[in-house]
Every structure is written in C-alpha cells, then in structure tokens.
C-alpha cells in the first residue's frame, strides 16, 4: 500500500497526523495521548523506534524503573497506570493493523 493510502486510512480510523520539528523526516501519528513516528520503508510506512506516551514534543517509551512501569523522556516521568498501558497497547495494535493492511 502506498504511504498516502496508509495515512488516509490512519486519519479515517481516528488517528491525528502531525509534524514535529525534532523529527523532520517522520510523520507523527497520535491518538489518546499515544504517539508514534512513521517513516517511509520498502513496503510503505513503518514505525520509527517505539510507540509511546506523548511528552511535550516527543515520545516517552514505556520502561521499568525501580520495579514499576513508567513513561520517560529526558528527566520527566509519567506513571504507566494500567489504563495508560491498555491505551498504548490498543494504539500499537490498531496502528500496526492499518500499516500491515494490503490493498485489496
């Protein structure tokens, strides 16, 4: 599927598309405070790095610190509550499903 078709499907599925100065070659995809950066790949758009929690103009990946799950970006920490983890998992699942769709 062409990148523009993937972006259209993401938009129609309720994802917000944005640009970020820190990632000029990527398209930011947001929903429910989750974010991923997409870049062109050999088979269409692909996720750059991890998906994570939006923290300012960047992404806080889910990590474990001192026995608890948190989202971290630079010195900032956001608690990874069970609700936030479920939201992130749903975001990742829905995003990957659309990116992996083949044109029928």
Placement of each model-derived feature along the sequence:
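Negatively charged, low-complexity tracts enriched in Asp/Glu with abundant Ser/Thr
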Residues: 1-32, 101-104
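Hydrophobic beta-strand residues in large extracellular and virion-surface proteins
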Residues: 10, 15-17, 27-29, 36-38, ...
């Amino acid at each position: 599927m062409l990148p523009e078709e993937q972006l259209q499907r993401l938009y129609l599925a309720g994802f917000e598309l944005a640009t970020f100065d820190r990632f000029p070659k990527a398209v930011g995809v947001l929903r429910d405070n989750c974010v991923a950066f997409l870049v062109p790949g050999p088979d269409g758009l692909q996720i750059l790095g991890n998906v994570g929690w939006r923290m300012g103009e960047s992404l806080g990946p889910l990590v474990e610190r001192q026995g608890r799950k948190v989202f971290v970006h630079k010195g900032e920490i956001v608690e990874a509550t069970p609700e936030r983890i479920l939201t992130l998992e749903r975001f990742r699942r829905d995003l990957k499903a659309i990116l992996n769709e083949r044109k029928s």
